[in-house]
Amino acid sequence: MSDFFHSDVLSVSELNAFAKSLLENHLAGLWIAGEVSNLTRAASGHYYFSLKDSRAQVRCAMFKGAAVRLAKPLKEGDHIEVSGKISIYEARGEFQITVNEVRLKGLGQLYEAYERLKAQLQAEGAFAAERKKPLPVRPQCIGIVTSLAAAALRDVVTTLKRRAPEIPVIVYPTPVQGAGSELQIAQAIKTASQRAECDVLIVCRGGGSIEDLWAFNEEPVVRAIESCTVPVVSGVGHETDFTLADFVADMRAPTPTGAAELVSPNRQESLHRLAQAQCRLKTVLEQRYFDASQKLDWLARQIRHPRQKLDEQRASIGKLAQTLSYSMTQNVRTHTARFERQTQALKHCRPDVSVCKKNIDRFQTALSHAFHQLLTHRRQSLTAQAALLEAVSPQHILERGFSVVKNTRGQVIRNADVLKQGQKLHIIFADGETDVRVSKEQGQQDLFDCI
């Protein structure tokens, strides 16, 4: 001690400094448990409180840098465990703890593991709303994962029978607390997912201490819910109890009974909604029928309207035709009367017109007679010339037994002197044609061979 102090008599400051050194050097790294009292939170974000038990208390200060790491704010009466620098505030000689870390009393490593797993799941997006599966509106089968001895099972089954007795229920039994229960709960969830017998799955248990509910904070249960192909509704504990299973489930209910109400349609509500739907459907159908009738009437009027127009146009055309006929008749009568008047006037002016007309008629008759005689003579002459031409026509000559012989260039062969043995010829008869070849010399019989 003499090495630390200058004399055996200590000053107050020396005493406090010595005590501070001892505390900081020998009590580092300890966890101290107690109840929060006299809690004050400064505007700066610092916490000042006393940590007490039944026989003593110690002043604590937790500065903002450490306070921001709290999972939730401190409150009066919290039972916690703190770790930090145990020391003395020298100016007043007050014993205090400068707190660096806080955890709930009794949870220790479990709570720390809880926070780590929660942070990991949060980072993985396991709590994200977009990964939540929607619950079926009217499930055909409901599954329940819980203990057969649990009061929660009776509550859920009673609620389902009351609200939707027609929906079958399948129970996947498992212990819900105790050593190894988390593995059995996870296996029951996996079994329900693999069998795919139900449309929605309730994972539930009744209320209890945090230790009783802890299995639903374990990673096997959380991962089983996350990977389940069936929508999962959690109903663990009471409304104020939250577990990691609640965060990762597709829907969280405050209680097991609440979970049953979430997954089951209420019979009375369903009947009421059905009646409302029928009423709305009837209204819609009546309105559509009325609209269709109105449209049909309008279309019928539109169909009659063109017929009326056609009738009107037909009547108008008839009137116009009558007017035109009357006008033409009047014009003809007028011009006829005018022509007759002019004819009579012309007769009076030229008395010899009638004589000239008679001469013209006589001349016309004589001209017509002479034309017919000339036409008859011309026809007779044409017939005689046609007969003469027919008599001397090549075809007529051929019909009398003659033929025409041509070489390959189409030239007519008039005598046999020009023919050569083997020469090709073309012969035309009255009833056909053929090709031949000269086979013998001139003067021999059978001069030609047919090809």
Curated annotation (Swiss-Prot):
It is found in: Cytoplasm. Its EC number is 3.1.11.6. GO terms for biological process: DNA catabolic process. Keywords: Cytoplasm, Exonuclease, Hydrolase, Nuclease. GO terms for molecular function: exodeoxyribonuclease VII activity; nucleic acid binding. Transmembrane segments: none annotated. Belongs to the XseA family. Heterooligomer composed of large and small subunits. HAMAP family: Exonuc_7_L (MF_00378). Bidirectionally degrades single-stranded DNA into large acid-insoluble oligonucleotides, which are then degraded further into small acid-soluble oligonucleotides. NCBIfam families: xseA (TIGR00237). PANTHER family: EXODEOXYRIBONUCLEASE 7 LARGE SUBUNIT. This is Exodeoxyribonuclease 7 large subunit.
